[in-house]
Amino acid sequence: MNKIKFADYNEGQDIPELRVGPIKQMDLVRYAGASGDFNPIHNDVEFAKSAGLPGTIAHGMYIMALMGRQVTNWAPPTQVKFFGVKFKGMSLPGETMVFTGKIKKKKEENGDKLLMVSLTAANDKGEVKVSGDLTVKAE
């Protein structure tokens, strides 16, 4: 993986997109096993409906993990200085998720060359499910 170089990027520039999906119920089962989160809203359709949901929903942390994959496909983990998200909506089985990012600011601070990136996870209809912020320490 190539290091991110400060001079190679400009404000407003996109980072590489990641598309994942459609999300399958089995993806949620696998994530539940890996994370230990067996809340039935993620794996029991009838329970989820009884809780007022349209059906099962993806774990928010699963969607965040996919966003993390987008980040580390682009930047080596050693260059990630900050990664945080806000959950905006529920992701459902059958949806294809599109992860995008845009460099919103370049700055030098205390000798560090930083790229500030805004991240978005939306379904293929454009409905935003997660937004995030990323800071990369560039070379």
Task: Kindly give the residue locations of the regions a language model identified.
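HotDog/MaoC-like acyl-thioester-processing domains
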Residues: 1-15, 90-139
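Short, intrinsically disordered/low-complexity patches at protein termini
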Residues: 39-41, 80-82, 87-88, 117, ...
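Generic structural detector for well-ordered beta-strands
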Residues: 19-22, 86, 135-137
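Catalytic strand-loop segment that frames the active site of acyl-thioester-processing enzymes
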Residues: 1-56
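Hydrophobic beta-strand-centered segment that forms part of the acyl-chain substrate-binding groove
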Residues: 49-58, 62-103
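Short, intrinsically disordered, mixed-charge
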Residues: 33-36, 72-76, 124
